[in-house]
Amino acid sequence: MIRDLEYYDSPILRKVAAPVTEITDELRQLVLDMSETMAFYKGVGLAAPQVGQSISLFIMGVERELEDGELVFCDFPRVFINPVITQKSEQLVYGNEGCLSIPGLRGEVARPDKITVSAKNLDGQQFSLALEGFLARIVMHETDHLHGVLYIDRMSDKDKTKQFKNNLEKIRRKYSILRGL
């Protein structure tokens, strides 16, 4: 089932997500729904708060990045439950980011080029992954969602132009009206 997305000014996007304590059938269904939702909106990652669930879970639909920058997508997204970034490189790299919860806007964000992330999968097994480049960026972006942080919070002030802020306000108004706020 494709779930409704939470948008820019939704309070749930600013909350710290609760840890997942048990892997249930409901959690498995949430992951299936998130997978359909991510595919429908053509995302590369999706965090549970973006579909209204304030729990520490996200999915990533990219398996790897080829040398030419082309992305290889997974048949089924990788699941990260209670993820923790355990290592980050000191080298920061700027990259252009967007977010399904802030449709139509993109911005430059500096993030570490390499990370190691530890999490559980849907079978409850702990795993650790060393990632770099775009895959590392996806994991950091989605992990930020679990801490109530949006990519716009990580943009430099100079990149938040008046036009960017005006567009952000238009998004806020549009989706507040759609939600009946």
UniProtKB/Swiss-Prot annotation:
Reaction catalysed by this enzyme: N-terminal N-formyl-L-methionyl-[peptide] + H2O = N-terminal L-methionyl-[peptide] + formate
Keywords in alphabetical order: Hydrolase, Iron, Metal-binding, Protein biosynthesis
GO molecular function: metal ion binding; peptide deformylase activity
Superkingdom classification of source: Bacteria
Its EC number(s): 3.5.1.88
Catalytic site positions: E142
Enzyme class: hydrolase
Co-factor note (free text): Binds 1 Fe(2+) ion.
Gene Ontology biological process terms from the UniProt entry: co-translational protein modification; translation
Residues noted as binding Fe cation in the record, renumbered to the chain: C99, H141, H145
InterPro entries xrefs: Peptide_deformylase, Peptide_deformylase_sf
CDD domains: Pep_deformylase (cd00487)
Cofactor: Fe(2+)
Function: Removes the formyl group from the N-terminal Met of newly synthesized proteins. Requires at least a dipeptide for an efficient rate of reaction. N-terminal L-methionine is a prerequisite for activity but the enzyme has broad specificity at other positions.
UniProt record similarity statement: Belongs to the polypeptide deformylase family.
The protein's name: Peptide deformylase
Gene of this entry: def
